[in-house]
Swiss-Prot record:
Signal peptide per UniProt: 1-27
Name recorded for this polypeptide: Bifunctional xylanase/xylan deacetylase
GO cellular component: extracellular region
Organism: Cellvibrio japonicus
Domain spans labelled CBM10: 616-645
Amino acid sequence: MKLPTLGKCVVRTLMGAVALGAISVNAQTLSSNSTGTNNGFYYTFWKDSGDASMTLLSGGRYQSSWGNSTNNWVGGKGWNPGNNSRVISYSGSYGVDSSQNSYLALYGWTRSPLIEYYVIESYGSYNPASCSGGTDYGSFQSDGATYNVRRCQRVNQPSIDGTQTFYQYFSVRNPKKGFGNISGTITFANHVNFWASKGLNLGNHNYQVLATEGYQSRGSSDITVSEGTSGGGTSSVGGASSSVNSSTGGGSSGGITVRARGANGSEHINLRVGGAVVANWTLGTSFQNYLYSGNASGDIQVQFDNDASGRDVVVDYIIVNGETRQAEDMEHNSAVYANGRCGGGSYSENMHCNGEIGFGYTYDCFSGNCSGGNGGSNSSAGNSSSGNTGGGGSNCSGYVGITFDDGPNSNTATLVNLLRQNNLTPVTWFNQGNNVASNAHLMSQQLSVGEVHNHSYTHPHMTSWTYQQVYDELNRTNQAIQNAGAPKPTLFRPPYGELNSTIQQAAQALGLRVVTWDVDSQDWNGASAAAIANAANQLQNGQVILMHDGSYTNTNSAIAQIATNLRAKGLCPGRIDPNTGRAVAPSSSGGSSSVALSSSSRSSSSAGGNTGGNCQCNWWGTFYPLCQTQTSGWGWENSRSCISTSTCNSQGTGGGGVVCN
């Protein structure tokens, strides 16, 4: 793979560059690493070897050239600091071809969080959207093109703050600009807004430049950059072209309209918001608008649940916040039959199998033109009067993922008690299968304060493993967790955060969403309790922190301060949505009476399964059938997981309980 670290080396110019003396107003050619200002613009130039050079010209213009003797180089002109709202215009020539490994991009850094970002306008032989181990976040339209968004993680790599672990955000233009004479406009706010809608937040800006970059290649550029005017309006989900039918019965703030039809007229769908079924309908054979008029908040899914011979569902779109979201623009579709299996495709309006299409969050605004609220503060779904103690309080302005790896073990009971005492629930446990097998009796304690998911069986390095080896390791862990009485995991955190396409494919085949972290507490590296609490204090809405359940006693000592700091910021613990990997609100807080379900959804047999009569268990925002024969813990009845009444009602603050119609 080429170019996975391009841009990293720019950082070294900030740490050890040879500073220029007084900058001349005349053209000046740089052949040594340097940063500074020139004719009112910030510039950066770095190379690790070879003949690459950059010439500073008037205003925002620079020229560059490099040959195959240069391993890696990058340079450009722009601003320091950058900002979220700048509109960047550029023009000139980009002298590479499709065989050369190079980018032309808006490039920059932020702190708190530490983020390296790219808006790729053109590239050669390597498409950065294929970076190994990354996560795709869909696409949007800006400045006359579609941009595909991907996030990658860099582990212990150079940054503007030394060697760090951080995320890269990529927006990659499609179609790319090409080569030769080139010009364009980047309305950066559109990228910032779309990233933020997916939980990809920027921090405080450092530099921001229109950069040329090359890796083991040859080429040249002559680029002039300036601040311009927007050429492409607000961002929107790519491809959303259908208009809203004038007969729609909804779409205003606080309601959701689903436009759908069935193949034979007996298909049944549920509307799920924040993990709960809020409405359900039996479809006709022609498109109709189905209206939910409540105000539930959270992630939105349309679920098909009675697949049989001759039954298929077509979902045209939904309307929320006055915005139309086309089904074919949504990445998550576990019901489409493609590539020889159910759930084998994306971006389709068809539902051939039982499953769901994910439509984002109620507070998202993909088009930038919404009539309802789309701020993070609207993500709270609770009707509880319990304040902000626990994961669903009415004072929550956002939700974060509190996660612990490597359990269960001798520390688990102590940690569970601390979490309860400080109302820091729900949490997400990423368990090792071998520890589960040895300590199955601790599973119920973990489940009493959150959810349990997959962290491999033996915590190995797996990047050199075959697909089958990875699959077996993860599947063995799933079985251990289920044998101990927990539901089948839907999330997987790779050991050491190491990820490649093989690991990703094996996880997907097992129905596991790969989840890493936004903030590393460094508890595994000997961080003090104060340092761990300070790390947690960096969390923003939707983000996830890495901590550990084990011999790291400083983690236990930090729990009280973490809880205090989060409450002061209006942030509450949440669950991690398996569709997005983001922390979201539990759909309930403070007991079963706070669960907001419509009467039609409560009576639906599909909502709670065939066990437990007309009752079901709200387990930290996810609904499971009640066991009929098992009296305690989790069970397996009628070919699916179930939960006993006593265990369901044992959840702590922020949990749910038994819900009956």
